[in-house]
């Protein structure tokens, strides 16, 4: 789908240049040029002959329902699973239509997390995940389950015994392991009850999520000092994967992490994976979240893909939470602490264009690395659904996804 025009003539208005990433970074063309590219691509998408594209293409934004499906565009490049994070509130209406058209896989954004499924010990609520399973069934989609064990959305009771925080005593370790097993077993039993023939749409699972800290902290592999770690140490990851394999033997088991384009974090991440494999822990896939920013170095994402392949060519790989932020924090590569930031560009059109050019680099890399990637998942169906607009993050200027707040095709889409 890539059809980006050559540099416009001087008479074409150009956008403010992006902050320099390095000397090799290509100069950014003007916004008018990107709009021209969108017009030409629109004409192609709706079947207008190339020679008449400029005359026939509409001047207004093109609805996402009228353009080529991303699952076909990236599928033609060799990506089998083209996914989207979605919530149970999106199973009907225009969001459902857009998702069904463009994606062949989906990730539950929150419905698979422990606080949604087991908010109180022994009381399970599968209503949200069931809606998503039904949606996947109805539209022939696969589910990438996310995520049984992640501290920020694991309820507090998981780590307490009669109000007392669990320690690393043998008794407390046994209690936490028992709770981990009860949780995984309940999910597996519920899925099995819905799919007694074993034909569940769940093809993969993020077993653990974000276990590596952003800098040295003295723990093995700089693992985060969470209650999971304080009670079980590094072995909590072993326990999680062994339980997942026991109860979901046919599902591909992934470990998921953010900021994997950082060389130091890459070293910690792959060091942990290497040790897990040496202990014969059933890690089958390695994911890069890829919440990136305007100055992120796409080559560092590629370097991590190559490093995983060098570690073990049998490991599956996924880009699991793709979006492109345009805040000052995102521009410095910090994908976790984005609160109280400001936009890089004050003009929304400039933001959209800059994000589009990052996606162009991303899609080029994804095509080149398609043989190493099992899955690419966008973290939201459109810009009205992005986590970056949530009250806890509060960055309304961000336009991180291929489709806009009205589900129109954005420059990020045309870059595909």
Give the label of every model feature segment:
Residues 2-56:
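Secretory targeting and sorting signals
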Residues 58-105, 109:
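Boundary/entry segment of secreted carbohydrate-active catalytic domains
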Residues 61-69, 118, 161-162, 190-194, ...:
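Aromatic-rich peripheral "rim/lid" segments of glycoside hydrolase catalytic domains that contact
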Residues 71, 101-119, 127-254, 258-260, ...:
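Substrate-binding cleft and catalytic face of glycoside hydrolase catalytic domains
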Residues 84-96, 114-127, 212-216, 220, ...:
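Acidic-and-aromatic substrate-binding clefts and catalytic sites of carbohydrate-active enzymes
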Residues 86-102, 129, 180-190, 264-276, ...:
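Short, acidic/polar
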Residues 158-177, 263-277, 389-401:
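Short, electropositive alpha-helical surface patch
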Residues 259-284, 304, 331, 384-387:
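Substrate-binding cleft/loops of secretory-pathway carbohydrate-active enzymes
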